[in-house]
Amino acid sequence: MKIGTVRTVPIFALAGIGLVGASLWLFISIAGEVMEGETAAWDRRLLLALRSAADPALPWGPAWVQEMARDFTALGGVAVLTLMTAAVIGYLLFAGKRHAAIAILVAVAGGLILSSLLKLGFDRPRPELVPHGSLVYTTSFPSGHSMMAAVTYLTLGALLARVEGSIRIRIYLLSVAVLLTVLVGVSRVYLGVHWPTDVAAGWAVGAAWALLCSLVMSRLQRRGEVEPPDTTTRSPRC
């Protein structure tokens, strides 16, 4: 078992580092294209594709679809993500996993700070092509909702997946995290408050940050500096 563990850990670590690098490369590529104005036509086409053909001022679909989009977009808002993160941190503290709680706090708070700095740095205006379906207070690139959804849901999904012994349940947990992240991002374009490239960039840099934090947490767990998941009552199963 020890031999298998020694061989497996570096493989997963290298794969994770590769994914972090790929996500950062994607973000940098999108940012470069946006700054050069190469994505303007593509952004415009995709945004209008989600609007009514008869009246582009209206989002596609009936009123209940628009209401669902607002519900989905709220899942990436600061209030919802703060409450969710606080609940998880509270659970970890009650479970005696103080260092794990600190790691989650650093991951989410660090992502929020990074998102704010990137917005200030790029200072891209919001779309004015269609009316906004949600109130906005900051600049457009990258999408803060999309980025923070990726940071929070992927980080928490990875945390829960480590506790679970079943491969199928691990896949399910990570799939739910990805689905929530995608729904938040698509809703931002649907509501006309972000260009598609804002969302894609938010996903890319958010995933990179979440993966990096997950790799660091795994490393600290192996060194005993962060409490490992409690798997004493679970056995790996398919």
Model-derived regions, located:
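Membrane-helix interfacial "entry" motifs
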Residues: 1-9, 63-70, 92, 96, ...
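Membrane-spanning helices that line or support transport/gating and their immediate boundary helices
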Residues: 30, 105, 117-121, 199, ...
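Membrane-interface loops
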Residues: 48-54, 83-167, 171-175
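N-terminal transmembrane-helix/juxtamembrane module of multi-pass inner/ER membrane proteins
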Residues: 1-79, 121-122, 126-132
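Short, charged low-complexity intrinsically disordered segments located at boundaries
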Residues: 73-82, 98-103, 147-148, 182-189, ...
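Alpha-helical transmembrane segments of multipass membrane proteins
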Residues: 19-24, 111-115, 184, 209-214
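Hydrophobic alpha-helical transmembrane segments
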Residues: 11-15, 79-82, 101-106, 171-178, ...
